[in-house]
Amino acid sequence: MPLSLGPDPRTERLRRMHAALLTRYGRIERPSEKRRKPEWVLVHGVIGAQTKTAASNASTDALLHEFGDWNAVAAMPVAELEARLRRQTFPNVAATRLKACLETIIEQRGSVDLRHLSNLPTQDAMAWLETLPGVGRKISAGVMNASTFARRTMVIDGHHRRIMQRARVVPPRADTARAYDALMPIVPGEWSAADIDEHHLLLKKLGQTYCRPRAPICESCPIRGDCATGTAAAA
């Protein structure tokens, strides 16, 4: 008879971290009525490398407002897209990736329309997204979670991954895909897509304020008790 190992203790750690972050920061919710269409979330992700969220929001909204739909954006020359993406940290890279991504969707689907993903299991939908130019695990998870799809996937940005590595929840050298594969099986089963989204936003906030890339402020970090690095710093 196989031995039951019981629940993974890291699941309870995630619950404690979440509770501590809520106490420190309060709720960071994305109201359902403010969820964007998946195509918008995809564009936002593809152009957003190393760019503040507010700037990427503005760029994505401006493109859709000017051109009316993403098919028209795909038809624009890279140079003209680059001029419109000047808010982005790397406008040329953003423009090149965006055009390639949108053109690939049109080649495969006839237009920039991701509605077919709603009929696929989440893992299959993410795998399809990750075949597109410029799309990795962070973006595919974002499209499935933060859009109107509202699936139980976890966006893992640089802040999130760094915190989980320092806490020894995921392997120290894990890339985004490996960190995702380590985290999703231990996400509390009762968490909804909105809960998972909020967990990511709380960890992002922590990474911007306490668990910074350099000189983290471990002594006053709200999750220090569940972080191997924070506990060691306090010893």
Report residues per predicted region.
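Catalytic cores of DNA base-excision repair glycosylases
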Residues: 2-235
